Amino acid sequence: MFYTTVGKIIKELNLECLTEISNIEERKIKDMNLNRPALQLMGFFEYFDEQRVQIIGISEMAYLKTMTKTQRRNAIEKLFQRDIPCVIITSNQEPFDEFLEFSKKYGIPLLRTSEVTTRFMTNLSTFLTHELAPRITRHGTLVNVYGEGVLMLGESGVGKSETALELVKRGHILVADDAVEIRKVSEKTLVGEAPEIIRHLIEIRGIGILDVKNLFGVGCVKDSERIDLVIQLETWKTDKEYERLGLHDQYIEILGIKVPTLVIPVRPGRNLAIIVEVAAMNNRQKKMGYNAAKALTERLQRQMSRNGNE
């Protein structure tokens, strides 16, 4: 189970701490969903998920203002009695004294943001989706080629890094080399990025480690990219039949998501950078509804039909 911490969302989203809680940096958040506790403030806790961050917006605060002091005190205490990660007040609203009191009493962090509720929840949800997404690390290289995220896989020494370097020279964007952290951010989307320690670095045998950002400029690197195509590079095997028409799409499954894949044989003299460029453009063209192999097949069928009629 992946998790992030309250301390991390404070730093990432620039939140204000309204109370001092000793374990705030280590307090875990394990659920990417958020909750606005309107029903809970009314006393209804059935199906209440304690692992969710609680958001107090203008509506919730307005409802609390309609209560008597005793009712409000009871409602707020019942919320803080639960083992929730934290409570966040939006729109820079002033909290009732009871929020501060029970935050300290039960050790629940009370935070505040100046952003309006909807915008803040969108930003927080995006951050939590990234942090809590299922993930794996694969040995490979990820490059943005004509807007397509291309993940190159293959055994060590097959030419992934050299191909990526040539692509960068041709104006494309490096995302990760050697190790790619892949996250499943939705049921249909995989996003890859480099581990922070090797971000923007590339290893070229015979030269060593290169800093692509410093060598080629910030326009040649990117922190993360959606994975649209997987290219598997392998040494050319004379006894193996490789795809020549492209009629049958192949897929590789990563974290339960099927991604289009191509197997590209490598041998001296082949310009892999151009092949990867064309593969990326062809994949994009297929997503737009045109398949050159199928168009050729249909053209041949029409020609054969005309010849038969003659």
From Swiss-Prot:
Keyword Nucleotide-binding: yes
Enzyme Commission numbers on file: 2.7.11.-, 2.7.4.-
Catalytic machinery residues: 139, 160, 178 (proton acceptor), 244
Coiled-coil stretches: none
Co-factor(s): Mg(2+)
Any GO BP annotation: regulation of carbohydrate metabolic process
GO molecular function, one term: ATP binding
Catalytic activity line of the entry: [HPr protein]-L-serine + ATP = [HPr protein]-O-phospho-L-serine + ADP + H(+); [HPr protein]-O-phospho-L-serine + phosphate + H(+) = [HPr protein]-L-serine + diphosphate
Residues binding Mg(2+), per UniProt: 161, 203
Superkingdom of origin: Bacteria
Stretches the record annotates as Important for the catalytic mechanism of dephosphorylation: 265-270
InterPro entries the UniProt entry points to: HPr(Ser)_kin/Pase, Hpr_kin/Pase_C, Hpr_kin/Pase_Hpr_N, P-loop_NTPase, Ser_kin/Pase_Hpr-like_N_sf
Keyword annotations of the record: ATP-binding, Carbohydrate metabolism, Kinase, Magnesium, Metal-binding, Multifunctional enzyme, Nucleotide-binding, Serine/threonine-protein kinase, Transferase
Gene3D superfamilies: HprK N-terminal domain-like (3.40.1390.20), P-loop containing nucleotide triphosphate hydrolases (3.40.50.300)
Annotated ATP binding sites: 154-161
Important for the catalytic mechanism of both phosphorylation and dephosphorylation: annotated segments: 202-211
Domain characteristics, as noted in the entry: The Walker A ATP-binding motif also binds Pi and PPi.
The protein's assembly and partners: Homohexamer.
Task performed by this protein: Catalyzes the ATP- as well as the pyrophosphate-dependent phosphorylation of a specific serine residue in HPr, a phosphocarrier protein of the phosphoenolpyruvate-dependent sugar phosphotransferase system (PTS). HprK/P also catalyzes the pyrophosphate-producing, inorganic phosphate-dependent dephosphorylation (phosphorolysis) of seryl-phosphorylated HPr (P-Ser-HPr).
Family membership: Belongs to the HPrK/P family.
Miscellaneous comment: Both phosphorylation and phosphorolysis are carried out by the same active site and suggest a common mechanism for both reactions.
Protein name (database record): HPr kinase/phosphorylase
Organism of provenance: Caldicellulosiruptor saccharolyticus (strain ATCC 43494 / DSM 8903 / Tp8T 6331)
